[in-house]
Amino acid sequence: MTAFVLLHGFAQTPASWDAVVQQLQAAGHRTYVLDLYESKCDLKLLSTEGALEDAEQGKGVEGDAGAEGALASARDPLASLGAVCDRVAAIVRLVAQADGAPVLVGYSMGGRIAAETVVRHSDLPLAGLVLESAGLGPADEAARVALAERNGAWAQRLREEGVAAFMDWWETLPLFATQRDLSSEVRVAIRAEREAHSAELLARSLEAWGAHHQAAEAATLSAVSDLARQGVPVLYVAGVLDEKYAAVAARAHAVGVPVVLVPNVGHNVHLESPSAFGGIAEGVLAEGGFVEGALA
């Protein structure tokens, strides 16, 4: 049994991981799904099956004053990218106390936060790191400035137009083109999830957690590569139809980060092909590791 800590993407909720959670639990693993937008955090509520009950009684989780103190101090995750990363790191350490080092999995914005957490907390106890369609930071200062301007414009649009109008536009972006082929039931659920958040909350997350605050891509790749050299399985996952993040995957692969490109899917691999993604995440733990490359 291994624990998995899962971080959702922009305008998502923990429910976005439901299909993957079911697959991992069926294989005997424990799952902790963090609501990145929640201002308060009770670790017991993160467990999708109450996995911490035994830990509180006998494994000393409550006695980990350092991790608990860090979690308490990071209760306003929207203060900054550093604040949400500190919170993720504290949760990872508490889960490690309860269940052993977990696999940290992040999608898109959640993947950026996972990667930045590794940059800022090099001593994090991890059994694996899976980054799905995640930006790894600006290439240079010009890119950082452009990202800051873009995220600021998006935040302003949210505040001026509201969530519904913003999402009408958001869903037309080429990044989400493949999601238009999903069933109407799934698309309705995605839209409801996106509209569950307030415009101000989403705007603040763009301003506080945007890619313009990340370490440069070279620094992120260095930290992720260092993790792999320490024997921690690391994997970057992208959909073949997502040209932007398939290119990020290629740059990661060029410096030795293992990559899996999943065919016939776009940006959100775990939504468009949950069984494939669940198998990839679980495969990080397999003896000999996952099979790198494009899946047939």
Regions found by a protein language model. Give the residues of each.
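Short beta-strand element of the alpha/beta-hydrolase
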Residues: 3-8
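Active-site glycine-rich loops that stabilize anionic/oxyanionic intermediates
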Residues: 9-12, 108
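Active-site loop/oxyanion-hole signature of alpha/beta-hydrolase fold enzymes
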Residues: 15, 19-22, 26, 30-102
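Short beta-strand immediately N-terminal to the catalytic nucleophile in serine-hydrolase-like folds
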Residues: 104-106, 132
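Gly/Ala-rich beta-loop-alpha elbow adjacent to hydrolase catalytic centers
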Residues: 106, 110, 114
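Flexible "cap/lid" loop of the alpha/beta hydrolase fold
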Residues: 129-158
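Conserved serine/cysteine hydrolase catalytic core
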Residues: 195-251
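Catalytic histidine-centered segment of alpha/beta-hydrolase-like enzymes
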Residues: 265-274
